Regions:
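Soluble non-cytosolic domains of exported or imported proteins
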Residues: 71-79, 96-100, 164-168, 185-189, ...
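Short, low-complexity disordered leader/linker segments with a strong preference
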Residues: 1-39
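Acidic, polar ligand-binding/catalytic clefts
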Residues: 86, 91-156
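Alpha-to-beta junction loops
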Residues: 89-91, 107-116, 160-161, 196-209
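Extracytoplasmic small-molecule ligand-binding "clamshell" domains
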Residues: 29-32, 37-118
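Ligand-binding cleft/hinge of the Venus flytrap
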Residues: 55-67, 81-90, 169-187, 192, ...
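Short coil/turn segments
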Residues: 45-48, 70-72, 120, 144-148, ...
Length: 212
């Protein structure tokens, strides 16, 4: 059973949805891209509860995942996307992307925006535009009940095998604020499997995700 250490990182993670607004002019190469139609194309992982997840039916207002057959997505990010599409008078299409492919998806014009709990870091702001933050959350460590019993402060994480998702603010915070033996992993499913297998002692997550 997973437990949460709610001490990690003396910071608040700010998350906002991103939209690409860096291209001021249109060319023949990007004509007919997502933003040129009456469809709003939104990218997310569809694997980051409670913000977004995948399910097999359309219960509770779930939306079809356009690029995954017979699967739907729901969650806070999905409901935000629906409201934005409604306000713009557009039909919503949600696409499931790996985390590292989300920003390139916007840059290439395949996506209109990302709604995926993405933090507006300086590096990302050089590539895409961000809205105002729509959510803030604390970072915590998810662990098994028998792990990390001696951890009371950030300093106690020294040498511990802690994972964080690659390409995220979580990994940066773990590396900069602790001397833990940081493990970089591709997604939260992989980290949870590693935790259950004993490969790692814990992983970094936002508090709502850790509790989901």
């Amino acid at each position: 059973m997973k437990k949460i250490i709610a001490i990690l990182m003396a910071l608040v993670l700010t998350a906002g949805f991103a939209a690409c607004g860096n291209t001021a002019t249109k060319t023949e190469d990007n004509a007919g891209s997502a933003s040129d139609s009456d469809v709003l194309k939104v990218g997310m992982e569809c694997n980051y509860a409670p913000y977004n997840w995948s399910q097999a039916d359309d219960s509770n207002g779930a939306v079809p995942i356009k690029n995954v057959d017979n699967m739907y997505t729901n969650g806070y990010d999905v409901q935000v996307a629906l409201k934005i599409a409604e306000a713009l008078g557009k039909k919503l299409e949600i696409y499931s992307y790996e985390w590292d492919s989300l920003i390139p998806g916007v840059q290439s014009g395949k996506l209109d925006m990302i709604i995926a709990g993405m933090s507006p870091t300086a590096e990302r702001k050089e590539k895409i535009d961000f809205s105002n933050n729509y959510f803030t959350s604390n970072l915590v460590i998810v662990k098994k009940a028998e792990n990390l019993k001696d951890v009371k402060t950030i300093a106690d994480l020294d040498g511990k095998k802690i994972a964080a998702q690659s390409g995220t603010f979580h990994l940066t915070a773990l590396s900069e604020q602790t001397k833990a033996a940081a493990n970089e992993m591709s997604d939260f499913t992989t980290m949870l499997i590693a935790l259950k297998a004993g490969t790692i002692e814990g992983y970094v997550a936002e508090e709502p995700t850790a509790m989901a």
